[in-house]
Design a protein with these regions (language model features):
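Amidase signature
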Residues: 2-4, 148-173, 336-496
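Intrinsically disordered, low-complexity proline-rich tandem-repeat tracts
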Residues: 6-31
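Surface-exposed, charged secondary-structure patches
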Residues: 38, 69-70, 77-124
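Short, solvent-exposed secondary-structure junction/capping segments
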Residues: 40, 44-51, 59-75, 278
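Hydrophobic pocket/interface hotspot
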Residues: 46, 58-59, 66, 79, ...
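Gly/Ser-rich catalytic/binding loops embedded in alpha/beta enzyme cores
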Residues: 105-107, 114-115, 129-271
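Structural helix-boundary/capping segments
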Residues: 146-152, 268, 273, 279-364, ...
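General beta-strand structural signal in soluble alpha/beta enzymes
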Residues: 180, 222-227, 275-277, 393-395, ...
Length: 551
């Protein structure tokens, strides 16, 4: 386990990116073919470029076009442009030397090279490359990199163990592991909120948040404390201090936030459950981007004690899982008992099943990218023609711009009340994007906030009426996860217009990984009336089973 005292972990600083030392070619095994001199020269030049992080030279060494390949433990990149975009964000690699290199000719103008890297700071890595002579130059057409094994991925985890904290030995969640978003109190540890300055000054917590304790009492163990976007004030999933967690479904794409760490941990198989928060979409967005199940619970249904707030009027707690059955187990336990010491199941509004009737909000579909809308329409048509056809009808939700504007105003006012004093005392401590959101929030007046709250009241009433006798269904987000190199401002605005209404109304919403668009996952969101969270997960599993059976 790391960070066992709750203290700030030692920063991991890459070794200086100095040029690789000139080395004689490692001796080839007896009988092995010798590497052609011009190919070895190209390989050595590539090594110098990669250690120096010479992006232009590295781009020039990979063959142009859409068929060039590069893979590593995170997944496969296809095409020169995708590889170049990944490399621009990666940063340099630690200093290393080539310990071994092996050559196998594949033809007169193509060859396989496999090499072992010895890192100056310890550890070894493996590179497999296919080189081809194109227009007189040796270029890489395919590469696979096996990096040295890290102690932990600091983009995903603040602290991690096996387990980090053991739960009860028996219970309905026994054997499952949890990635806890770095907003929840764990006795003896600090809350870091995705910011190293905040973590450094925080005091260890004296008690564990009920949302964490519930999972431990049910037999789950904690895998660790997972990263969050700073102060949970983002939906992209990036963090300027710790880096961007990998998207477990789409290489080089944003993971979605602000519950980025728990989502990536679950998607990559590091944990079974992500304990997360959702204010404006921070569970639903990463669930959609990474092909996960994600439940935003009814507002105030799960106690928020011991959770660092962003905007209390909308903050809610929920979970991310890889499958619907696990999400059902978590919801059944965490939402069905009457108090922490009770063994009686109290299902309340979830005692009955939700209707097999769905409404599709037209205004939300207007925010959806064409390919995603087409995939969603095909799904609904197939379900309607199935052996268990649900009914679908269109509904109107009014002006989403007005809803989002009012929501953002109230959210910003509360966020500034929660964190403004700290931000004023620590200028420059947060990244530019989050700093700008807080700057805008600081300008909101009491009159602005009161007016926005008044605007949200009829919107919440309308949504409650819409889901009174049916369940709302629509794509969770406009489309697949944007690449990390993309300009996400327009995507962010469209996404929040889709996710804010359910949050403004305090309704439960579940994202189901049902759509594929361009090979990437996109979720389908179901929204039901308040308090029906357990029944909503049951309905979502029925919906997903039917969708899976007709594909």
């Amino acid at each position: 386990m790391t960070d066992a005292t709750g203290a700030t972990p030692e920063p991991i600083t890459p070794e200086p990116a100095t040029p690789a030392p000139a080395m004689p070619a490692p001796a080839a095994p007896a009988g092995a073919p010798a590497i052609p001199a011009d190919l070895r020269a190209a390989f050595d030049a590539y090594e110098r470029a990669i250690v120096a992080n010479d992006l232009d030279a590295l781009d020039d060494f990979f063959a142009p076009g859409p068929e060039t390949l590069r893979g590593d433990t995170a997944g496969l990149l296809v095409g020169h442009d995708a590889i170049s975009g990944f490399r621009a964000l990666r940063g340099g690699v630690p200093a290393r030397e080539i310990a071994e290199i092996h050559y196998r000719p594949l033809g007169s103008d193509s060859a396989l090279l496999m090499s072992v890297s010895q890192f100056v700071g310890g550890g070894r890595g493996l590179q497999t490359q296919v080189w081809q002579r194109i227009d007189g130059r040796w270029l890489i057409t395919a590469a696979h990199v096996t990096p040295r094994t890290p102690a932990l991925d600091r983009t995903i985890w603040r602290s991690v163990g096996d387990p980090f904290l053991q739960g009860a030995w028996e219970g309905p969640l026994a054997g499952l592991t949890v990635a806890v978003k770095d907003l929840f109190a764990i006795a003896g540890f600090r809350i870091g909120a995705g910011n190293p300055t905040y973590l450094e000054e925080a005091r260890p917590e004296k008690a564990t948040a009920p949302a964490v304790a519930d999972l431990l009492r049910a037999g789950a163990s904690l895998r660790g404390i997972a990263r969050t976007d700073e102060f949970a004030y983002s939906i992209a999933g990036d963090n300027v201090h710790y880096g961007t967690p990998p998207n477990g479904a789409v290489v080089g794409a944003l993971p979605g936030g602000s519950s980025s760490g728990p989502a990536s941990a679950v998607a990559l198989g590091h944990a079974d459950i992500g304990l997360a928060t959702d204010t404006a979409g921070s569970i639903r967005v990463p669930a959609s981007y990474q092909g996960l199940w994600g439940l935003r619970t009814t507002h105030d249904l799960v106690p928020r004690q011991g959770m660092l707030p962003l905007a209390q009027s909308f903050d809610t707690i929920g979970w991310l899982t890889r499958d619907g059955e696990t999400l059902q187990r978590v919801a059944d336990w965490c939402l069905s008992y009457d108090g922490s010491s009770s063994t009686e199941n109290v299902y309340g509004a979830s005692g009955d099943d939700l209707p097999w009737r769905f409404v599709v909000p037209e205004e939300v579909l207007d925010c959806v990218e064409p390919a995603t809308r087409e995939a969603f329409s095909r799904l609904l048509a197939a379900l309607a023609a199935s052996d268990d056809p649900p009914s679908f009808r269109a509904v109107h939700m009014g002006d989403l711009d007005a809803t989002f504007s009012a929501f953002r105003t109230v959210q910003g006012a509360e966020a500034w009340r929660n964190d403004g004093d700290w931000l004023r005392a620590h200028p420059g401590a947060v990244g530019p994007a989050v700093a700008e959101r807080f700057r805008v929030a600081s300008q909101i007046t009491a009159y602005d906030e009161a007016a926005a709250r008044a605007e949200l009241e009829p919107i919440a009433a309308l949504l409650a009426e819409v889901v009174d006798g049916a369940v709302m269904v629509f794509p969770t987000v406009p489309g697949p996860a944007p690449l990390r190199t993309a300009d996400v401002d327009a995507v962010r605005a469209a996404t929040l217009r889709m996710t804010a209404p359910a949050a403004a109304a305090g309704l439960p919403a579940v994202s189901i990984p049902l759509l594929r668009v361009g090979g990437a996952p996109v979720g389908v969101c179901l929204v039901s009336r308040a308090g029906t969270d357990i029944a909503l997960v049951r309905l979502a599993r029925r919906f997903a089973a039917l969708a899976g059976g007709i594909r």
